Every structure is written in structure tokens, then in C-alpha cells.
Amino acid sequence: MNMTYWIYLIAFVTVVAIVLVVRVWLKRKNEYALLCERVHQQTEHYIFLIDRKFRVKETNFYELNEDIKDDQPYVLGNVLHCQTAIDEGLCGTGIDCNTCPIRMVINNAFKLKRNFDHVEAVMHLYDKDHKAILQDVRVDGELAFVGKEPFFLVKVRKINR
């Protein structure tokens, strides 16, 4: 076999590998885009696409609360304006975060890779005037994968007191 044959073979294999990598990348990008679209289509709940560290990747929270400033770190408790998260600087760092029922359920759901629903809790939230209020919430979560990366689509609904 001559040298030209090997050069063409290597070039062909390289092109095929590049095409496969691009296809995988586009598939993951499309999966993520579909999840983001689902987040913004929901209007009766606050929707959060979060990773294992509770970092918010997408949300409709600020679209539904135009009077609330988008000035918090993109971590679940901070975006929701949880009093403990804001007072401590970051969701998950306060002493009360260890007993937060929402945090415990989501952590467990990530470990078990299972959906959860109808979790009710009372949250201490700040309103737009930075006044602390007690708010009953119902939380549901749906496991979603982008490629092999697990995320949760978390739905939070306020329950009137």
C-alpha cells in the first residue's frame, strides 16, 4: 500500500470523527434548548432548571416578577429571595440550610435520580420591599438530562396563607 492511500484513510477517519463529535454536540445543545423552552412556557409556577449545586441555569422567575430586581446570585434560594440565603450571602451556606426541606428533597432526588412532587414547606422570603414574609410553597421536581449531565426542572408554586 502506498503512502497516498494512508493519507486519504487518515483524512477520511478524521472527517468522520469530526462529524460525529459535532452531531453529539448539536444533540446536547438541542436538548438544553428544549429544556429552556419548557422553563419559559410555564406561567403558573416559578420554574428553575438547576444543577447539583442548586445553580439556576434557566428560570421564569424574573419574567413573572418584573418588579423584583435581578441582583442575586443565580442559586435557587437567592433567586427565590429566601431570607436565609440572602442574609448569609448564598443559598446553602446558612446554618438553617441544613434543615431546609426543599434542599433536602432536591439533594435526595439527585442522589436517587428520581422525580419528586407535592413537597410543601414554609419559606421565609423577602418581598420586593425587602420585608420578610412567611410563604407556604409547593415544590415539584422532574429529572432532566442534558447529555449525561443531570439537572432538575424545579417548579415552585406559592400557596396562599
For the regions a language model picked out, list residue spans one by one.
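Sensory modules in modular signal-transduction proteins
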Residues: 29-66
